[in-house]
Amino acid sequence: MYRALTRDIEVTVEPFYLAEQSDPEDSRYVWGYRVVIVNQSNVAVRLINRYWHITDQNGQVDEVSGPGVIGEQPRLAPGESFEYSSGCPLDTPSGIMFGRYEMETDDAETFDVAIPAFSLDTPDLRRVLN
């Protein structure tokens, strides 16, 4: 699991390889990831936008942004959490993702919350250390 805490908003990400949706012979590798956002602050916040920076093992970068997550702009009161799952296809057997959520308070103050960097590695990927 990967965690980041920004202004008492905790974001936890757990990636997992989806072998049944992947086809290595066709250079298609697919991961899912589960995100849990916990509002540990004393004010309500709404997730209004997302931004992802995705890099495959060849250095190819893909940037994804848009309103909310999975079609929602969830509002989290103090102490509440929101969980969702999504996915990411790559043409290579490994990569890395990180990003941010734009949050808004009930007073219309906006701020960014970090999504921690997390690795996307196929289970059979061998690491070579020199």
UniProtKB/Swiss-Prot annotation:
Coiled-coil region: none
Q: Which InterPro entries match?
A: ApaG-like (IPR050718), ApaG_domain (IPR007474), ApaG_sf (IPR036767), Uncharacterised_ApaG (IPR023065)
Residue intervals of the ApaG domain: 3-127
Name the UniProt record assigns to this protein: Protein ApaG
Q: Which gene encodes it?
A: apaG
